[in-house]
């Protein structure tokens, strides 16, 4: 085999983006690279951080053997790809109808791509949020719904249309979650942008998915970890159904249900906004032409993952996902990223009874999923007894299936004691891309299947190894949003204010969901 002369090295992060279908297998002192276009054998260290050439006859012979073996593997993989069923055929399994049995170990590639895609919906809530305290628009979304995905360069999401932005009142005791401007004249004194509701409208996308997908994406906290200190670790009755023993953490409940009557953006609570919009979309699409089913997918990261679970439970508890015209139960799936515990064991059991499917994607080194519920949680053998017999006020339980990932398995990430890195969403999506299963051989093989750009990891943190030469926290608006006006002065420009949805619009659908408008019966009972 002729010696290789490569213009790129493994130190270049673009190497992986530009080489489709890379498959890495580590042999002693050898890295084997297989692509759809060519197969080659590269000598490198086991850490995949240095490359050297081979001149000995023995190593040349080894190369030939590796090439032959991997050509056979490549052919088998290509044949397997041809046999692979389409997403539209297995979307129910990907959405968790069987609790992802047989899909996580090894990782099903359709599921991998969908986890990443929904994670990007959650990441978009960070990337579009104005957290600049020097801006009068601090706490709002920087983009209009019509060009939201275009501005974020999310071409894979262009088949969706955002139908409603979600807002919450900032007049609750979560100071590290809400962002406020330092200026006196601002877009809203009481509201923060919380996320959006979107629906798949492009017929090609609907056909690819196999159904009409309604997405609810919740924003997490810009401060990453500081918001944890705001949690009171107090359980309160959810009051979304008839069972007062179903309880969720008080801070999450307040964020979801509180409102500010004097504010046009939060005169309806985040709960009322999302329920009204889901009701409207189900009425519009739920009975459409035969052949199209509907799904509801809720996603969020960190505190946003908490809201994702609460809202998914709420929709199911109210039976909002039932379409009586064709007796169809719309499946509800939560893709949760780095989420904390939300409610007690009875809350977890009720989610299971209602058929809410939850896939929790976590980094094992992240501390957020371990709170609240340090004293009593789902790992405690007698939790059910403690809750039923003693009304223990600090008992929490995770809901759903866990996909636990380890950032130490990635050769691209450096060792760090920064807890924010372990909690970072882009880093988590990077781990999803490289994960292949729990067995020993799969854990050794970290291969980026979708070729997700590793530079994204450093978008808002410093986690990549130095040899990739990607600056930390690199994402920001050009000139931090400053522009030169007609007088030659640099200023933060005005932008068109988004008008809130009219109260009549929300009230009409809310009336059908809750039975009355501006319901005052959601005052929590704390324990």
From Swiss-Prot:
Gene3D superfamilies found in the cross-reference section: alpha/beta hydrolase
Range of the transit peptide: 1-52
Keyword Chloroplast found: yes
Subcellular location: Plastid, Chloroplast
InterPro entries with a match to the protein in the record: AB_hydrolase_fold, Fungal_lipase-type
UniProt main location, coarse: plastid
Induction remarks: Not induced by wounding. Slightly induced by wounding.
EC number: 3.1.1.-
Phenotypic consequence of gene deletion: No visible phenotype under standard growth phenotype.
Recorded GO MF terms: galactolipase activity; phospholipase A1 activity; triacylglycerol lipase activity
One of the record's GO cellular component terms: chloroplast
Active site feature: 302 (acyl-ester intermediate), 366 (charge relay system), 423 (charge relay system)
Expression by tissue: Highly expressed in flowers. Lower levels in seedlings, leaves and stems.
Keyword DNA-binding carried by entry: no
Catalytic reactions on record: 1,2-dihexadecanoyl-sn-glycero-3-phosphocholine + H2O = 2-hexadecanoyl-sn-glycero-3-phosphocholine + hexadecanoate + H(+); a 1,2-diacyl-3-O-(beta-D-galactosyl)-sn-glycerol + H2O = an acyl-3-O-(beta-D-galactosyl)-sn-glycerol + a fatty acid + H(+); a 1,2-diacyl-3-O-[alpha-D-galactosyl-(1->6)-beta-D-galactosyl]-sn-glycerol + H2O = acyl-3-O-[alpha-D-galactosyl-(1->6)-beta-D-galactosyl]-sn-glycerol + a fatty acid + H(+)
Region (Disordered): 55-82
Listed Low complexity bias regions: 55-65
Main enzyme class: hydrolase
CDD domains in alphabetical order: Lipase_3 (cd00519)
Extent of Basic and acidic residues compositional bias: 66-75
PROSITE patterns, sorted: LIPASE_SER (PS00120)
One Pfam family matching this protein: Lipase_3
Chain ranges for the short sequence motif GXSXG as given in the UniProt record: 300-304
Function description: Acylhydrolase that catalyzes the hydrolysis of phosphatidylcholine at the sn-1 position. Moderate activity toward phosphatidylcholine (PC), monogalactosyldiacylglycerol (MGDG), digalactosyldiacylglycerol (DGDG) and triacylglycerol (TAG).
Protein name, per record: Phospholipase A1-Igamma3, chloroplastic
Source species of the chain: Arabidopsis thaliana (Mouse-ear cress)
Gene name of the record: DALL2
């Amino acid at each position: 085999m002729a010696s290789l002369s490569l213009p790129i090295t493994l130190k270049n992060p673009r190497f992986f983006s530009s080489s489709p279908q890379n498959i890495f297998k580590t042999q002693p002192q050898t890295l084997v690279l297989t692509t759809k276009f060519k197969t080659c054998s590269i000598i490198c260290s086991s850490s995949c951080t240095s490359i050297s050439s081979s001149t000995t006859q023995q190593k040349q012979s080894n190369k030939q053997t590796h090439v032959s073996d991997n050509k056979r593997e490549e052919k088998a993989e290509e044949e397997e790809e041809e046999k692979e069923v389409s997403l539209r055929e297995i979307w129910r399994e990907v959405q968790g109808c069987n609790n992802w049995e047989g899909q996580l170990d090894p990782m099903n590639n359709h599921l991998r791509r969908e986890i990443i895609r929904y994670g990007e919906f959650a990441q978009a809530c960070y990337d579009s949020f104005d957290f600049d305290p020097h801006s009068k628009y601090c706490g709002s979304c920087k983009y209009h719904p019509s060009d939201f995905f275009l501005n974020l360069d999310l071409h894979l999401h262009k088949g969706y249309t955002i139908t409603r932005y979600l807002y919450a009142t900032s007049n609750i005791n979560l100071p590290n979650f809400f962002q406020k401007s330092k200026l006196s004249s601002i877009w809203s004194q009481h509201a923060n942008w919380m996320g959006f509701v979107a629906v798949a409208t492009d017929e090609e996308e609907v056909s690819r998915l196999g159904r009409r997908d309604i997405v609810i994406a919740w924003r997490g906290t810009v401060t990453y970890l500081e918001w944890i200190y705001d949690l009171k670790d107090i359980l309160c009755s959810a009051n979304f159904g008839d069972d007062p023993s179903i309880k969720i953490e008080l801070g999450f409940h307040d964020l979801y249900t509180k409102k500010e009557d004097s504010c046009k953006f939060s005169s309806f609570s985040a709960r009322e906004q999302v329920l009204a919009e889901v009701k409207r979309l189900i009425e519009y699409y739920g009975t459409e032409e035969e052949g199209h089913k509907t799904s509801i997918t809720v996603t969020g990261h960190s505190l946003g993952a908490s809201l994702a679970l609460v809202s998914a439970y709420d929709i199911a508890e109210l039976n909002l996902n039932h379409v009586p015209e064709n007796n169809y139960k719309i499946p509800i799936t939560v893709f949760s990223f780095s989420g904390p515990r939300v409610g007690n064991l009875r809350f977890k059991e009720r989610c299971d009874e209602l058929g809410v499917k939850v896939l929790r994607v976590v980094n094992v080194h992240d501390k957020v999923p371990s709170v609240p519920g340090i004293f009593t949680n789902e790992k405690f053998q007698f939790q059910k007894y403690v809750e039923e017999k003693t009304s223990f006020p600090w008992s929490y339980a995770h809901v759903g299936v866990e996909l636990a990932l380890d950032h130490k398995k990635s050769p691209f990430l450096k060792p760090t004691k920064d807890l924010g890195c372990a909690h970072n969403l882009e880093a988590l999506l990077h781990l999803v891309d490289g994960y292949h299963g729990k067995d020993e051989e799969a854990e050794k093989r970290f291969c980026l299947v979708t070729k997700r750009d590793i530079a994204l990891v450093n978008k808002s943190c410093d986690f990549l190894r130095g040899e990739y030469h990607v600056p930390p926290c690199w994402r920001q608006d050009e000139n931090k949003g400053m522009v030169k006006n007609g007088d030659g002065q640099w200023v933060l420009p005005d932008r068109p204010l988004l008008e809130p949805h009219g109260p009549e619009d929300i009230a009409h659908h809310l009336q059908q969901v809750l039975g009355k408008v501006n319901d005052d019966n959601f005052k929590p009972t704390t324990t």
